Regions:
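Substrate-binding groove/exosite segments of carbohydrate-active enzymes
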Residues: 1-123
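Short, glycine/acidic-rich hinge or "gate" loops at secondary-structure transitions
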Residues: 6-12, 63-65, 127-131, 148-159
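Secondary-structure capping and boundary motifs in well-ordered enzyme cores
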Residues: 17-28, 100-110, 128-135, 154, ...
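Conserved positions within tetratricopeptide repeat
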Residues: 45-48, 129, 137
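Structured mid-domain segments that build the active-site/substrate or prosthetic-cofactor binding neighborhood
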Residues: 110, 117, 136-146
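Inter-helical turn/loop segments and adjacent helix faces that build the functional surface
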Residues: 115-133, 147
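Acidic/histidine-rich catalytic neighborhood
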Residues: 142-184
Length: 184
């Protein structure tokens, strides 16, 4: 809505039609912002600026985790802090399980992608220099600090992360928690 431009609002999971995620903001804007940027760039900018206004909280989260850059939360509350609950109900198994979805670090990549897509759609270099570029750089710094070099393969890997399937937080029979390189 055009009214969003005046608000400090993000794109909540499931839009406005479900209570399952309590209005938290995830990465769902990655699916809609590229189109919004082409049709109503002022709304796209406002929604990405929502993330920019929470950049200091994301930097603090990265620092607390011993990382550089900006660590955006998987479930962001209104102030930008991580709001992922400790337990998750699995409707397939009918059991509660630990909710490790806070390991879904790709939310930052979605934010950086949306910032770049907004710039490409609008050509707004001033916005990119003042806000969008800062988001892109800080997310890049985070992933550079997450990556570890494997000298045996001469490749970089990211361990302990989780893909977008919140019910599968690790590969079967693998040591440790999370996934390697966001793959199953």
């Amino acid at each position: 809505s055009p009214h969003t431009v005046e608000l400090d609002a993000g794109v909540p999971a499931r839009g406005l039609h479900g209570e399952g995620y309590r209005g938290h903001v995830f990465w769902d804007e990655v699916f809609v912002l590229p189109v919004i940027a082409l049709r109503t760039p002022e709304i796209s900018r406002a929604l990405i600026d929502y993330r920019w206004r929470r950049l200091d909280a994301a930097r603090a989260a990265a620092t607390a985790a011993g990382l550089a850059g900006a660590l955006f939360p998987w479930q962001s509350g209104s102030d930008g802090r991580e709001e992922t609950p400790e337990a998750l109900y699995n409707p397939r198994s009918g059991r509660w399980m630990p909710d490790n979805s806070y390991r879904q670090r790709h939310v930052g990549l979605a934010i950086a992608y949306n910032a770049w897509q907004h710039y490409q759609a609008t050509g707004d270099l001033e916005w990119l220099a003042e806000r969008g570029g800062e988001l892109i750089i800080e997310v890049t710094r985070l992933f550079a600090s997450l990556a570890e070099h494997d000298s045996a393969t001469d490749r970089f890997h990211i361990a302990g992360v989780m893909g977008p399937d919140e019910f599968h937080d690790g590969a079967a029979d693998s040591p440790g928690s999370g996934l390697r390189d966001n793959t199953y």
